[in-house]
Amino acid sequence: MPWPKEHKRNTRERIVGAAAAAFRQQGFDQVSVADIMQRAGLTHGGFYAHFTSKDDLLIEALAHASTQVTSMLESPPADPASADRLLPAAMTYLSSFHLAHPEQGCPVAALGPELIRTGQKFRNELTAEIRSRLNQLYDLTSPELPPKIRRQQIAGALACMVGGLILARGLKESERRKFLEECHSFLRAALVDSNPKGATPKRRGTPPSKHTNSHRPRKSL
């Protein structure tokens, strides 16, 4: 008697979840199909009833990991009245927990350098994840700011977030917390202390496509 569809779907999800955690924790090349199935509590032979290869599995594992990061960054801000939620999200990303648990965190920080070395093999998946994160962070910026300033903020913030996490994981354990605190200070200065000096708020209700020069920040002489 064949297994019900729900059982097969649940088994597939177990494999994807186990792979997403293992790849981020140990690296794609360091994890075998047998390792993944053991982590999922399943037999090795059952893998090919769901996936054609480990490469095929990685694509779904990256999507699973991306969903986890999206949920992590959508945590409510400390100040619900604040229109700018980018800084709280960046602080959550650069947290001690995220630092210590790559298996539950950002796939770009955990796997990005490794996947880049594969050339075009997984480039589409990596690009999609970076774009997804940029879009999410853009929505967390203050709508009072001009679109150009918002784009600059998310580019700088994501670079600091991903780069900061990679560098912190490469440091001695005794140095990691201090380094994260310095990243926090930098982001706070860049995202909070520079406003409203660094940008002139746009009028409420003005769509980005109709944004005029009169509302843009003036260039310094």
Regions inferred by a protein language model and the residue ranges of each:
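Amphipathic alpha-helical segments that line or abut small-molecule/effector binding pockets
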Residues: 17, 83-98, 113, 155, ...
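Short helix-capping/turn signature of helix-turn-helix
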Residues: 51, 110-117, 159
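Hydrophobic/aromatic-rich alpha-helical bundle segments in the mid-to-C-terminal region
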Residues: 120-128, 140-202, 210, 218-219
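Secondary-structure edge/capping motif, primarily at the C-terminal ends of alpha-helices
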Residues: 76, 115, 168-172
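Hydrophobic alpha-helical connector segments
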Residues: 60, 74-105
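Alpha-helical DNA-contacting segments of helix-turn-helix folds
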Residues: 51, 58-65, 72
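Helix-turn-helix
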Residues: 14, 22-56
